[in-house]
Structure formats: C-alpha cells, structure tokens
Amino acid sequence: MFPLIQADAQAVPLRDDSADLVISEHGASVWCDPDLWVAQAARILRPGGRLVFLVNSVLSTLCVPDSGPASDTLQRPHADLGRMIFDGIEYHPSHGDWIAILGRHGFSVVALHELTAGEDAQDPEFYDIADHHWASRWPAEDLWVAQLP
C-alpha cells in the first residue's frame, strides 16, 4: 500500500526524497505555477524518481477559443501560451517551455506522448475541450514522463 495525499501541489507536506513516483493528471499540471509544483515534485522524489503528468496538448490549447470546444483552426498565437485565463488561471506552457522548466529542476525528459482518441472513443460528459472527432485527428492531451538522475 502507498499513501494517497491530497494537498497543495505548491507546498506538498512530504519530506524530501520520500517518493519514487509523482503523478499529476490535469491537476497541478494545469492549475498551479509549473515552476512551483515541478520544484515540489523534484524535492519529494528520490534520486531516479519519475514525474508523470498530463496536460492539454499545445495544439488543443491553440485551437480552443475563449469559450467552446477546440476548432479546426488556430484561435490564438503560439506566443500566448503560458499563463492563460479561461474560467480561472491555467498554465499551458509550450513544449520548449516544459523542457526548460523540467531541466531547471533537474529532470530529463524520458518521453512525451501526444495522445489522440481511438476509433471507438466517445465523448465523456466532463471533458468539453475537444470532442472525439477532433481528438481522433489531433492530439488532445500530452503525457510527459520525466526522471531525476
């Protein structure tokens, strides 16, 4: 068994070097300042520990208008990525920015998976950024895997 902890990702109440794996599934990775939560992940991970996190893909972020689902056309400039305001503050760094953020905190990128929907995908009730038609053509989410030395 392992403990599941619900806490502020910018101030995790765990001791240094206490975890082998840190996961964020659209939590800290979207709604917290990336430099702050990635620093916390680096602090609590043991040497060789892995950080796995999901974010909206860069392409879906560029194709989402201020309100409504992703469109087939770009809705904002690439330069607008980073700290963004939708219903609240969200963070959507570019791939290059993620690599820099991870590197600043001692991580190397092991993998980046740009996820698309499968042929039998259906639209979930809770996810309105991109429908399954859009997500079957372009990546709706990015899954990052990073590791400490």
Where are these regions (language model features)?
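A short SAM/SAH-binding and catalytic strip from SAM-dependent methyltransferases
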Residues: 21-35
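Short alpha-helix
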Residues: 87-112
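Core SAM-dependent methyltransferase catalytic element
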Residues: 105-108, 125-149
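Conserved class I S-adenosyl-L-methionine
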Residues: 50-84
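A short glycine-rich, Lys/Arg-flanked "PGG" loop and its adjoining helix->strand segment in the class I
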Residues: 35-50
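Class I (Rossmann-like) S-adenosyl-L-methionine-dependent methyltransferase catalytic domain
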Residues: 7-10, 56-68, 99, 110, ...
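A short acidic, Gly/Pro-enriched loop at the edge of an enzyme's catalytic core
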Residues: 10-21
